[in-house]
């Protein structure tokens, strides 16, 4: 009797090789996929060799289970991390301090109107980014999208501009943090720079999980502080503070001078408001380090609505009711004392609270500093994956850290010590930082505009090549027209910045002011043309645009909402969009 006389294949009865069981704690070391595009590889469980040996081994190259040579980023961020990062990501010195100069330049009405307009713009931008980030949770995120969906040369130019923005922001924010301490003490700024430099280096060297936990705590503090200020500001405005001799304020202050410096002041506030939202897009950059982008990113994206509605608009309306735009303290020397939030508390003669809120400002600056190193390092790593930066920046260790890119970024933090050059009675550091920041001053507009244009190209190509939106894990409810509007807003931002750079408030046209405001556009154009000549890249047609590599598609049954039917469907859609 032979095997073929039986009703089964003899190989089917051979014992199968069982996969080893992995505990939940150890699953953190294992990624869900491995592709060259996403930069994800399987993390091999570390051996128990002792703390110091594992610490040393952690710096060794990541082990690539599939042997494809792709660099690795560890998926160590959870839903909890992403949602707090999205809420607190843009709550920082732009809101707490930058709003003061905006109030002085354009008046309270200009501040409120422009922050609402920029909030609407970011609503469209972040939803477009969220859709692409769920579909392509890749290293480099929106910089990768610009390279693939727009033009490789444009992706190269925008990526380097974006990198320089956060690369320079790191030492600048360290200096800002040190200056903020002058609110309490005259201790040399170099002392505080050293302390916070060590702290930031430590946070980043411990990996993305520690980064996520630190940002979670810092964001939570900022959220609580901002909500607390809103409540306090309402009490102050209603005359509920016994130490405030002004009594009931109401709208008496905002009526005096709602607008300042005319149209020029309005345009100036428009660009200042846009800079205040810098960092919102980091949620998309972190997609490559999120365990389940489809479940995590949509919730983080939807938090943009609440961030704009509550933390920016409400708090700035109250600031406009409490602080006069003519207050000379608003245009101070860059310390925390010029914060309109601190001024509002000081004007009410509340003892102790100004120091508390000054501490919150320091925390927010630390958060921005921490995010800057994370963003610059991941951007440089992503560019190396796309061959837009030297290949050695792809190096990733066994803990999922882009080690060489991080070392380069963290090393530039020592540049903050140039602040000591001011001790001799000159302003060398101010001049140097002004021009360093000018190199990438428009990177936000280029990045946000590129996100919208990438989404437009992605949607057009997706439809052209016969795909359905039902295949996507998350779909922007604003669709392609939301991205068109978002792109239009960013073009207006560039036009407004050109206008105020050419005709500065309180001065006549001059080369210094113009190039400090618009140098980034010139440099980006040079990078774009230079890469075009070098690579001879071209814009692909819609039917040839590569939308399949790395695309994560889903069955419609998994993505549709079974409750999205019935008489309340329209209201459910609105609630699902913002909640």
From Swiss-Prot:
Subcellular location: Golgi apparatus membrane; Cell membrane
Ranges in the topological domain labelled Cytoplasmic: 1-83, 130-161, 208-215, 287-303, 369-401, 453-471, 535-579
Any one of the GO BP annotations: amino acid transmembrane transport
Highest taxon above the source species: Eukaryota
GO molecular function: amino acid transmembrane transporter activity
Annotated transmembrane regions: 84-104, 109-129, 162-184, 187-207, 216-236, 266-286, 304-324, 348-368, 402-422, 432-452, 472-492, 514-534
Topology Extracellular: residue spans: 105-108, 185-186, 237-265, 325-347, 423-431, 493-513
UniProt name for this protein: Amino acid transporter 1
Encoding gene, per UniProt annotation: aat1
